[in-house]
Amino acid sequence: MKRFSLTLLCFASSLFSAQGLNSQKETGTNLSKNINEQPVHQSVQLETDKVFNKLVNIRRIFHENPELAGKEKQTQEKIKQYLLDLGLEVQTDHYGYSVVGILKGDKKGKKIAWRSDMDALPNDYPDPEVFKSKVKGVQHGCGHDIHMAIGLGIAEVLSKNRKSLKGTVYFIFQPEEESFKGAKELLNNGLLSKINLDEIYGLHVTATPVGQIMVKPSEMFAYQKKIRIQLKKGLSEEELNGLTKKISNSLFRASSGSKPWEIQSIVDPKIGLTNPDTIFKDYLFTDGKFNTYSKNNESFLEAYLYETNSSNVDKIIPEVQKIFEDSGYKNQLLSVSFVQENPTVINNEKLTKSAIEILQNLYGKNAVASDYGQVPFFNDDFAYFQQKIPGVYFFLGGSNFEKGVIAMNHSPNFQVDEESIRTGVKSFSSLLIERLNRN
């Protein structure tokens, strides 16, 4: 998951109401009744439980041996061998250290992909796990080790249920997500000319309660842009500070009194993502102070900004230009541009609604939590796949507050409750089976 704010360090487990834990219990109550009516999903649950300890072990191997974006060589080899042992066709010639496992069902049908990212982070934060990273300065601090374990688990569970598969499942293990490069390069190197996909799915572990799946149609994150303002040199520090203050004030929109940059509040039941009145909708703000620097006798002002409404993005540059005109600095302004415009994750509405229906029918109404907002600071290059293929991206909770496990990505003491692996494998194995059988 690309880009993150350490303000998440501020959040407290008290923000997570008992509702999150109770929903897991309720889901379990509804589970047996629905599953008993469908043998294939009984098998999914059984096979998930059988393979769980094996997946925990390989997750820990990944955690101990992390590799940075573009250097996932050992990780690729472990994934490749795991998939080969399952009897899958395996391809490693698409881009970099990617792996594509191909599982063909006994019946012809759709082609669906499950994507898992592979790379680790360049940091040396405290890690409370016994199975710490053995590589100095490199850690799986974003949960991609969990993602890979889930991807391999789904492959194994579905391979045991091949007779129930109507179509083909492609398991895309993607390198270089943290650099926001891997998905784009896979597509640029012709992945879709070799595998013509109908749908694609993926997930990211988050700091929400373990076992909680969260998803919504359309945007999961705010639109993230890096704006650059190029000026003739000559303005004083005081003048530059005054201009950046005006720009920040102008590029701000939020509900009265709300602070959508305080990302720890995403889990607050009163204002967080699961509340229809969440503060994480209809906002615009810049991320902290503008970075100012000089180069080639010119001055530059740069900042990241976050906008939830796509139709407002094109209004930002003209608005900044107007500030310079109104402030009497029009002649000092050389250009205003977005210098980083990564796409954002946008879930296909039809597939998202179908996924919610499937998971709730099988695993209870609380199997999927409602999401009413858009998260700032985060992003994922899964968005590049969604530009080409209808797809859905899920959040999967990894925190267990009773145990002191906080799945706070990109932060010190990052941990994930490994029960999230079980939830991910079971839920999304069932989802893929059902989606293969639907138009």
Where is each model-derived feature located?
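Sec/Tat-exported extracytoplasmic proteins
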Residues: 59, 63-66, 70, 87, ...
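His/Asp/Glu-rich mid-to-C-terminal helical/loop segments that flank catalytic regions of hydrolases
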Residues: 237-249, 253, 257, 322, ...
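Bacterial Sec-dependent N-terminal signal peptides
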Residues: 1-24
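Acidic/histidine-rich catalytic neighborhood of metal-dependent amide-processing enzymes
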Residues: 146-219
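Active-site-adjacent substrate-binding region
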Residues: 248-283, 337, 341-398
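Midchain, well-structured core segments that form catalytic/ion-binding scaffolds
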Residues: 197-325, 334-344
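Acidic/His- and Gly-rich active-site-bordering loop/insert found
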Residues: 30, 34-140, 149, 164-165
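Divalent metal-coordination and catalytic microenvironments
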Residues: 62, 83, 101, 114, ...
